[in-house]
Amino acid sequence: MDSKESLTSPSEEIPSSVHGQERGNVMDFYKTRRGGATVKVFMPSPSLGGSSQSDSKQQRLLVDFPKGSVSNVQQPDLSKAVSLSMGLYMGETETKVMGNDLGFPQQGQITLSSGETNLQLLEESIANLNRSTSVPEHPKISASVAVSAALLKKELPETPSDVSSEQQNLKGQTGTNGGNVKLCTADQSTFDILQDLEFSSASPGRETNESPWRSDLLLDENCLLSPLAVEDDPFLSEGNLKEDCKPLILPDTKPKIKDNGDLILSSPKNVPLPQVKTEKEDFIELCTPGVIKQEKLGPVYCQANFSGANIIGNKMSAISVHGVSTSGGQMYHYDMNTATLSQQQDQKPIFNVIPPIPVSSENWNRCQGSGDENLTSLGTLNFSGRSVFSNGYSSPGMRPDVSSPPSNSLSAVGPPPKFCLVCSDEASGCHYGVLTCGSCKVFFKRAVEGQHNYLCAGRNDCIIDKIRRKNCPACRYRKCLQAGMNLEARKTKKKIKGIQQTTTGISQETPENSANKTIVPATLPQLTPTPVSLLEVIEPEVLYAGYDSSLPDTTWRIMSALNMLGGRQVIAAVKWAKAIPGFRNLHLDDQMTLLQYSWMFLMAFALGWRSYKQASANLLCFAPDLIINEQRMSLPFMYDQCKHMLFVSSELQRLQVSYEEYLCMKTLLLLSSVPKEGLKSQELFDEIRMTYIKELGKAIVKREGNSSQNWQRFYQLTKLLDSMHDVVENLLNYCFQTFLDKTMRIEFPEMLAEIITNQIPKYSSGNIKKLLFHQK
């Protein structure tokens, strides 16, 4: 039996009809106020008047059974017929109770075996129809209702005029419903077809031992079918017979929880109709009326909520899911995440998940409490004797000692391994200021002290790892410098270690001496940093030129690469100058003027230092990936300029300048040129310059230790600072020439071009004052 059936409340006179592609007979069972049953038979009759053809495609025949006319009906057959009509007979696997109107299948064929059983009441009751009404017979009655139509054709006359006159007379009568003909008067008693049905005596809102079918209908009109009564039936909607059941918006059916944990049974007016869907695959079969809903909280819980008498003492009715029958109070919670639903939209869900219904604040505060702590979801609702699992699935059949393993179990592990910053091998310690392995430590020491001239055969981008670290020494050495390896870091470490040992030795004392006297250390370690120590911290790192050594070397390529590298070095020099103690106290215009006058001093002196430390003053190490050797120096316009720059590195090599001396001399070169009219913060400038002159003297004393040679070395170092003016003057002249000569097509970065543009007029006018230590 493939049909769609729905039950309506007695308080509403909404007929169920089938609006499909094919019209057939439709039967509606109305619950009257007298407890009887009313049968409506819809038959197509287009032979009526043309004025009523549009809205009278289906005429309704209202049949009211008197109590005496059906006294000989057998009760067992009546019970079976009613149970079949209600759609709750579970023997038929194809029966569907959906949210659409009540109707028979489109085939509409009622076999003789089932028709005689279901329409046995009609055979005896329709015999009295010829006495009270007359309905025209349509000549083209559908074959889909052959049995029922044949029974009606024997009793109904074929006079269309009688129907028209009867309808006109009944339009103004009070006992009619639209165009329906009411055969029985109001004072006639009707046959109660529900009196012998075995329904549960318990009903929501009533006592347990009182049957709802014996209630006074005049006092409580909704008590007859209270478990199925709703104020607004959402299932009585028009739709095609072939349409699937869509999720419906139902009233809020969330279980109400008392303070003691018991469920509050909902009132009959608030319990919705069941939505039972039995597929061919038998995914789910609900043996008791229930609804499927979605909670308001984050996770979506699908659960069958049972009404009224089905929940007594926390005992749940049985549900069969995938062939697994549950009984004895078992309850299954299906915890589905909303994200999972969105990801699996192409799959057919077992449950029709219904969107959450907004609940008014008054009902929520009255039933659930006023605070967020009273929120209760089905996934966390525990009944006595039930074990709840972490995934929301609860069943008493599982052992209580079974527990899920911890999700994030951290095993006791040691410290993470340390890797070399150069070749990614396992590091053996901190060497030359960088965490490296022993192999890279030895390589860097030999590369610096051996004064090797490494050249990359590729593009200075070779991969340096544990296996290929010996393939390209140039790229390996470049990566060592990039990581920050420095030979001076080893000396600094030894000094710090010596200071710590000295402090520890002074602070140690015997117990007997400590009891008698308090020892004050003779020399305390200096807590405030010195200017030289700050200069070591702010020293800029080595930059790369990005020069492609695989292409042929030309003057244009090398000069353009040097200019691009110089632009980045100027930016680094600006940041370095602002970090010098006292420099930012100068006027902003003075800061800009000093940087514009000294940018070439800073780059040339730093180039000489790198060449002195890495190439023994034989090569010019502009960058780890751009080293000017003798072959590149022989290019046009290159030798004269390289000769001036090699002079600086050779002097540093000859004097064996220390790193602290280099830092002080570099700072003094920043303060070596001023305008002729002076600076706006001239006094502060002189004070800062004198401070670093004294720091240079301290560095000399620290290096020599013998006061007899300190003045001689100070003279040599300051003489080198004076000679830097001649070197920078020659370099600036060539730089200005290449900048102004557009035929050479030498590229200049934007910032460097702006500095040169502002500096050319000042040098041309001679508005520069050189601050020299010695007279020429």
Swiss-Prot record:
Native organism: Tupaia belangeri
Biased composition regions of type Polar residues, renumbered to the chain: 1-11, 161-174
Ranges for domain NR LBD: 523-757
Top-level lineage group: Eukaryota
Cross-link (Glycyl lysine isopeptide (Lys-Gly) (interchain with G-Cter in SUMO)) at residue(s): 277, 293, 702
Taxonomic lineage from the root: Eukaryota, Metazoa, Chordata, Craniata, Vertebrata
Processing and modification events after translation: Acetylation by CLOCK reduces its binding to glucocorticoid response elements and its transcriptional activity. Increased proteasome-mediated degradation in response to glucocorticoids.
Modified positions (Omega-N-methylarginine) in chain numbering: 23
Any one GO molecular-function label of the UniProt entry: steroid binding
Name the UniProt record assigns to this protein: Glucocorticoid receptor
SUPFAM superfamilies linked: Glucocorticoid receptor-like (DNA-binding domain), Nuclear receptor ligand-binding domain
Compartment(s) where it occurs, according to its Swiss-Prot or TrEMBL record: Cytoplasm; Nucleus; Mitochondrion; Cytoplasm, Cytoskeleton, Spindle
Chain intervals for the UniProt region annotation (Hinge): 486-522
Residue positions, PTM Phosphoserine: 45, 113, 134, 203, 211, 226, 267, 307, 404
DNA-binding region: 417-492
Keywords recorded for this protein, A-Z: Acetylation, Chromatin regulator, Chromosome, Cytoplasm, Cytoskeleton, DNA-binding, Isopeptide bond, Lipid-binding, Metal-binding, Methylation, Mitochondrion, Nucleus, Phosphoprotein, Receptor, Steroid-binding, Transcription, Transcription regulation, Ubl conjugation, Zinc, Zinc-finger
InterPro entries membership: Glcrtcd_rcpt, NHR-like_dom_sf, Nucl_hrmn_rcpt_lig-bd, Nuclear_hormone_rcpt_NR3, Nuclear_hrmn_rcpt, Znf_hrmn_rcpt, Znf_NHR/GATA
